[in-house]
Amino acid sequence: SENQDTPEERAAFDFLYASTKATKAEPNVHLNFNHAMSRVNLKFVPGTDPEGNPVTLTDIECYLVGIKRNGTFDTETGVAAVTEDAAVSDLRQMLNADNDYTFTAYLLPQTIGAEGLQIEAAMTTADGRRI
């Protein structure tokens, strides 16, 4: 789950899985697909700074911190699994008006620690402040 900057790149990580059996008596099959990956969506909306001043969104540098990004997908069972001893790394995306200030990523299902999912984001405001 390395490069997910664009919708086209993210589509490569959205694994779908379906399984069924055809028989001679029932040769037509219906496939019900399920997503094997976990999707994370973060949408940033304008608000106010700590002093109560309105903030207009500009380019936002956003990270999911400490994510395991290596694993396997079993095509027999449809199970996506993180490699438990995989190194952790950060997943970065630049958010702007073109992507509606929305971070979207497909991740291998994994257990996040008790502290929860850590998100870091920074933006330079129109008047030059870094928040």
Predicted regions and their residues:
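Short, low-hydrophobicity acidic/polar segments
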Residues: S1-T56, A87-D127
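Short, ordered, surface-exposed loop/turn motifs in non-cytosolic proteins
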Residues: P50-A86
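Edge beta-strands of extracellular beta-sandwich domains
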Residues: R129-I131
